[in-house]
Amino acid sequence: MDVDALLQSIPPLAVYLLVSGVVGVESLGIPLPGEVVLVSAALLSSRHDLAVSSIGVGVVAVIGAAVGDSIGYAIGRRFGMPLFDHLGRRFPKHFGPGHVALVERLFNRWGVRAVFFGRFIALLRILAGPLAGALKMHYPRFLAANVSGAICWAGGTTALVYFAGMAAERWMERFSWIALIITVVVGIIAAILLRERTSRIIAELEMEYKNRRH
């Protein structure tokens, strides 16, 4: 079975369930590659020989993000900040003091806007819901920022990838694979540099946290 035949054998419903499930669980506070799954599904929707709908992908991603964040909010509100102390000891790579301190600082600086813009930042996307609940953010304000952020993030990402996928097909007809590879490499390098900068900030905050405790 070739790749095209394999892709055509995937039921659209399975794609929609995967997108909503992974995005929802990530929004709940569990580190999963929600954005990777969303981008992959959006790329599938850009192929006209497949039955996956770009609108369907965007809608289920919005639902998954909004519901997952709300569940995360409820968990955070129920267990409070001790929840993050426990998770930090169990999973320091994702919930260490530096991670929580960075997100809490952004919440203190941006308020409810951190929920909206957090949808576009991996670390905030995971922690925004539970931390908003733990900090007792007013739920209607949280919900408004949560839903609007989910619509902009999921809808915007799906539309961008969908049109980029169609443009890439036309681009490869006119130019070459080399130009496309160069573009992808530049994008990967930019993502790595941004990730390293975030890691440095987290490391500094963790050191600051340890110094305060001593």
Swiss-Prot record:
The chain crosses the membrane at residues 10-30, 55-75, 147-167, 174-194. Belongs to the DedA family. It is found in: Cell membrane. Keywords: Cell membrane, Membrane, Transmembrane, Transmembrane helix. It comes from the Bacteria. It is a multi-pass membrane protein. GO terms for cellular component: plasma membrane. InterPro entries: DedA_domain (IPR051311), VTT_dom (IPR032816). This is Uncharacterized membrane protein ML0467.
